[in-house]
Every structure is written in structure tokens, then in C-alpha cells.
Amino acid sequence: CFEAPTKGLLQELLAGKAEVSYDKLGSVVFTNASADENAPKIMLASHMDEIGFMVKHITKEGFLKFVCLGGWWEQVMLGQRITVHGSKGDLVGVIGSKPPHILTPEERTKVVQKRDMYIDIGVKDEKEARKFGVFEGCPVTPYAEMAVMADGKTLLGKAWDNRIGWAVMAGVLGG
């Protein structure tokens, strides 16, 4: 689920410009053979994954307990808008925790731990969450729209570290 949209975009960009194959791990290989059999062979490699989450448990109240996939800091997680990729379509959610007005004075001085966070998708209970296609193992990604920042040259977006290599390869292959 995490990589499927990127794979699809690259297949569109490179249609007719490179041969596409796959390995058993889900890797995508684009080959652009030269007419000259003595031409050097060059490999460009990149990865397209992104950090995210996976639903571990749905509480009776309909909150989603989750595990992190990749490196997440607790300090930046609360209030993060996310997309839950359910079996019946994508759902908007937000990462939450116990609200500040019911925290003890000691709890207010500490960073909320991942284990104490949940995803709220706006349902009343577990049954309703399941009705919308949420399940244990359901993939979850951070929501982020690409934006141009103040200087007009700097871009803000997610998964750049992973996907910039794919953009370079698509450019080299003529996409």
C-alpha cells in the first residue's frame, strides 16, 4: 500500500521508454537496453518506501492503537493528520492521546509515549471502524500536501529522501 502509488506513477512515466520487471520482494526494475551490446551497463538504485504506521488494535471505543514503521519521534506525532488505508478506501484521522485537562501535573511535564497514543478516525466504536474497512494490520501514512515555501524555491513534502532517487532515475530513462 505504501509504495503502490509511486510504482504506478513511475510505470506511467516510463511506459514505452523502459522494460519493466519485478522481483519476489516487490522491487521494480526498469531496463533500458542499448542497441550497442558493448555499451557499458550502469545501475541506478533507489528506494521508494516511506515511514508510516500499522493498526495494531481497534479499541471498543473505535480508537486505533498502532505501531510505528520507521523512525518517529514522539515529540512530533500528536496532532499529526494521517490517512488510514482501509479495505473500503482511505480515511482521514489524527493522532491523539489523553487530553491535557485530565493529565496529572507530573504527566504534563513529560512527552507522551507512543504506546499512549491512538488514531482517532471519528467513529463511535470498534464495530463502526470495521464497517469503514479498518482492520488489524491496516496501513497508515502521514498526510502531507506538497507546498512551495516562502523563498519560492524550497519545497515541503514527505518521503523526499526516498523518492528523489526515483525522480532522478525517471529523468535519466527519459520519463
Predicted segment positions?
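N-terminal hydrophobic/helix-forming segments and targeting peptides
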Residues: C1-G175
